[in-house]
Amino acid sequence: MSKNIVSNFFKHIKLVSKHKWLVFKFSVKLGIPFRGLMHDLSKFSYDEFWESVKYYDGKVSPITKCKQENGYSKAWLHHKGRNKHHVQYWVDLGTKGVAPVIPYKYVVEMICDKLSASITYNGKNWTNSSEYEYWVKEKKRIIVNPKIENFLEEVFLNLKENGLEKILDKKYLKETYKKNCIDDKTEYYYEFKGEWKKVG
């Protein structure tokens, strides 16, 4: 085992631990301590852990690095199917265009996860705008029920304009979720029009 792998091993554990601690702190504040405690435990499974050590970067997710080099990540395929705080968990391309409204506790865990990852990877460069700017790009490449999209959009825009403490508020998130995801009775369907294209 090379020195680089050994170094990455400990750095990855430190990074994941920092991320989990922040998620737990946010989760406790928002009334879902159990979700914070159980958050991302699959990262310590063989399939996820060793790929993450191999592609550890410190500035971006190892999953992102692996995707950049290989076009896909086995760790991500394993992770998204076991963690309900990811929008990808709730998408089944074999269904007739229905993406469910993600339950409240998992969307709140998602917010905690996104905030923690953004703060962890951006470090001193993190600002109230960081997550909103990332979300604007991310929402273009994922499938998520528009009600959840509207909810996240409103929360991250509020973060950008008014700061972290304004959104780390249980009452605010419950009211915003209710407005966007429960009171809105609109039904949505998506059309998947994927097709293979030859490269080279």
Region annotations inferred by a language model:
Residues M1-G200:
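Metal-dependent phosphohydrolase cores
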